[in-house]
Amino acid sequence: MKSAINNFIFLFCACMIFIACGTKKGNIVFDSNNGGLFLPDGFGAVVVVDSIGPSRHIAVKENGDIYVKLKITSDAPGSVALRDEDGDGKADIIQPFGKYVNDGIFATGMRIHNGYLYYSTEKVVYRQKIDNDLVPISKQEIVLMDESDQWHIAKPIAFDKEGNMYVPYSAPSNACASFINTTGTSVQQAGQYPCPELVNHAGIWKFKANAINQTQKDGVQMGTGLRSIVAMNFNASNNTLYAVQHGRDDLHLLWPNHYSAWQNAVTPAEEFFEIKEGNHYGWPYTYYDPITRQKMQAPEYSGDGKTIANDQSIVNPLIAFPAHWAPNDLLFYQGDQFPARYKNGAFIAFHGSTNRGPYPQAGYIVAFVPFKNGKPSGTWEVFADGFAGVDTIVNVSDAQFRPMGLAEGPDGSLYISDSRKGKI
């Protein structure tokens, strides 16, 4: 997840007028090239802000103010607030704020809930009461403290209608391997069974949104068997939690006798799940093959790339996206500005792959999935493309921009943050 500076692409229907900051109105003039993006007919894009620093998730207040969680590698403010004062869709005020302990490169969460701004560093979920001021001035409260220190430590945040907050504790490993067995040039791992990481990791926990100073033991585990979750949200139409998983890596590197380099590039799928308490979604024992459309036994657990998983209790995905695309945010569209088919549908920001070599990298898009009655009602499609700025991405460093976070504005506009350069 490399990033250098940050972008906000502001998307909205071409026939609409944008209304921001309460009573202030202004006609939006779309960028002539839609900010470098390729969009469906009838949509336009405006660049909102430039060079605010590498960003993660974003949130938009009811008056149009924008809040961004930054990826911090130095002693600098960890968030930034933006305000459009003349209704042209571009930020006129850019105000960094907040210094937090243990911020770090995987600081991620930024959401607004019941009058509070919630945001997360790598190990802490904070909140502050927000009012008419652009930058929160209220006391900062610790909602949740993570006492562990591990890989996959990002903490996205989601809320339901009953006063609960959801935070993932992702897996600290690739496949829950217990030891390494080296034979010649082949390095193979044996998986632990049962996997001890499933006790306190590889799942999503439910907490009270209004409680302070919680730790993991105050929460209730929802789903398990989820390797790494950054894209997670509630669908308000059915009050159900959904998540898109980062699948495992290194099938060819660790198991070259079972998987070719090409199989490694296209397997396993990034899986889109409906999250239910008590469900097991497969990691580390299985993975989903997007070619065969089946759950397969993981090689660390006696799989060979051909053995179908026989545990019927493991839940299949609603949709299987291409391998290694790195789903980093999920938004269910609630507005009325976009055409009716987008209502309650899912937008997913794919950050883009890093490990498909020797084949080109892929992803770097925002996808859309139509929904009806809480289930996908059609195939997924590319909504926004062109972030990478090049036709062939040999290495992740070739990509000019990488879509990262999603937020919906009060008028139904869609905001997209980029984790590299800060174009708007």
Question: Language model features by range: what are they?
Answer:
Residues 25-39, 171-217, 224-397, 401, ...:
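Beta-propeller domain segments
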Residues 46-71, 326-332, 347-349:
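Beta-strand-rich domains and repeat architectures in extracellular enzymes and scaffolds
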Residues 54, 75, 93, 103-106, ...:
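Beta-rich catalytic cores
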Residues 58, 110, 157, 229-232, ...:
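Hydrophobic core register within WD40 beta-propeller blades
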Residues 63, 71-73, 122-124, 130, ...:
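Short loop/turn segments immediately following the C-termini of beta-strands
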Residues 65-69, 116-119, 164-168, 240-244, ...:
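Conserved beta-propeller blade signature
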Residues 93-97, 102-113, 122-160, 168, ...:
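Asp-box/WD-like beta-propeller blade repeats and closely related beta-sheet repeat scaffolds
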